[in-house]
A protein has these predicted regions:
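Ubiquitin-like/PB1-type beta-grasp interaction modules and other compact soluble beta-rich domains
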Residues: 1-78
Length: 79
């Protein structure tokens, strides 16, 4: 399991699955916070939590829950 930086100790963490990989994140992590943790560019990204696409406008207020299955999809140019 990959772990995000420990800010509040192990008791203040929750386990989520991001693109099929387990990740421990701080409790109350939002989608916006998750993007920062995994270090991806925000442009051209779509995110679904538990199979439901989350609008970009909701990323700052959408708090992840323990066991959340997050899919991060990035657009790629090409042909």
């Amino acid at each position: 399991m990959t772990e995000a930086p420990d800010r509040d100790g192990p008791a203040a963490r929750l386990d989520v699955v991001v693109n099929g990989e387990a990740l421990a994140v701080p409790a109350a992590t939002t989608i916006d916070g998750l993007i920062a943790i995994v270090g991806i560019e925000r442009r051209g990204v779509a995110i679904a939590v538990d199979g439901q696409v989350v609008p970009r406008s909701a990323w700052r207020r959408s708090v992840l829950h323990c066991g959340a299955r997050v899919e991060i999809v990035t657009a790629a140019a090409g042909g």
